[in-house]
């Protein structure tokens, strides 16, 4: 089985497809363990973010696609048009580019590297990684560090979190006059909330499944932040001007009916809603309501492209470095694959040496001269070492030109 990657991202699939193939964080350990023990793969790492779902494996790409469709209970024909299946060298290049932020919606964004490290950690804990994937990701992290150190690809990067504030400022003139509600208390919400907190909104509320985690985030944000439970949302939604949601829920948390009731109480005051979750936390139909401004991760593209031109120049240098590192890694892996063959070849040579040496010792014992024995030994050793290659070439003739060329290369006869 070969190294391969199967997946889809913001470039190949819309949000409506990506959310169907997303893996919930809580389900990821069992999923990656299942994949690595299936007929599809012997090693596996699953990367699932708001912009991509990718399965890095040692296995058969077609079987991996089938496993992915079965896992999410989807017809394979429905997802196949959006998927890419990469061979070994393409997989290496793709992993390097993703980790460096070269394949991100926000060119050069740093969060993806942490997300890959989390995916690898989960796979290691589930013992779903072997020599090939360990080697790939060890090199991936090294390349990502080198690219970010030696190039400017990540400089002036507009993150999804900072873009959230920019988008809100296009609707409301002063964030300081607003009440902001954050649904969820994970890494993305913490990043977004930190940017909003810097603008000193009138009130910030963190709604979460557990009050303790919500309080923990509020403590980081400052005095004007308060916690609440998700179950409180229907009663308080109308009090907020901005709602940002990013949870791991597999079903919508905020429905159209809940927003309709909140808008009636707001009396035509606009409600800005940003859904950064995949699958979505807010029902898509909310976007049809008057005075509700609903945005998803796919709507953020234009905003996060700010400064892209400068980063693209740096990206050219990064791509060159990535290409060099891909070639280096592939050579290393091919060299490692040759080790058993090299050992077998040397073992055969040693076997032939011992045989002719044994014959030579017998000849000397019978009284043959050293010159005669050495001459006979050299002829026998030459014949033994060249017998198999000569026989194979005679059988191949000129039809197998690759074999002929390979033998010429091995013995340096192609100069």
From Swiss-Prot:
A Pfam family it matches: GlutR_N
Residues the record lists as binding NADP(+): 184-189
InterPro entries: 4pyrrol_synth_GluRdtase, 4pyrrol_synth_GluRdtase_dimer, 4pyrrol_synth_GluRdtase_N, GluRdtase_CS, GluRdtase_dimer_dom_sf, GluRdtase_N_sf, NAD(P)-bd_dom_sf, Shikm_DH/Glu-tRNA_Rdtase
Binding residues annotated for substrate, in chain numbering: 49-52, 104, 109-111, 115
EC number: 1.2.1.70
Annotated catalysed reactions: (S)-4-amino-5-oxopentanoate + tRNA(Glu) + NADP(+) = L-glutamyl-tRNA(Glu) + NADPH + H(+)
Entry's Gene Ontology BP terms: protoporphyrinogen IX biosynthetic process from glutamate
PROSITE patterns xrefs: GLUTR
Pathway recorded for this protein: Porphyrin-containing compound metabolism; protoporphyrin-IX biosynthesis; 5-aminolevulinate from L-glutamyl-tRNA(Glu): step 1/2
Molecular function GO labels: glutamyl-tRNA reductase activity; NADP binding
Active site: 50 (nucleophile)
Broad class of enzyme this protein falls into: oxidoreductase
SUPFAM superfamilies registered for this protein in UniProt: Glutamyl tRNA-reductase catalytic, N-terminal domain (SSF69742), Glutamyl tRNA-reductase dimerization domain (SSF69075), NAD(P)-binding Rossmann-fold domains (SSF51735)
Site positions (Important for activity): 94
Keywords: NADP, Oxidoreductase, Porphyrin biosynthesis
Entry keyword annotation includes Oxidoreductase: yes
Miscellaneous comment: During catalysis, the active site Cys acts as a nucleophile attacking the alpha-carbonyl group of tRNA-bound glutamate with the formation of a thioester intermediate between enzyme and glutamate, and the concomitant release of tRNA(Glu). The thioester intermediate is finally reduced by direct hydride transfer from NADPH, to form the product GSA.
Subunit structure as annotated in this protein's UniProt entry: Homodimer.
Note on domains (UniProt): Possesses an unusual extended V-shaped dimeric structure with each monomer consisting of three distinct domains arranged along a curved 'spinal' alpha-helix. The N-terminal catalytic domain specifically recognizes the glutamate moiety of the substrate. The second domain is the NADPH-binding domain, and the third C-terminal domain is responsible for dimerization.
Stated role: Catalyzes the NADPH-dependent reduction of glutamyl-tRNA(Glu) to glutamate 1-semialdehyde (GSA).
Family named by the database record: Belongs to the glutamyl-tRNA reductase family.
Protein name per UniProt: Glutamyl-tRNA reductase
Name of the gene this protein is made from: hemA
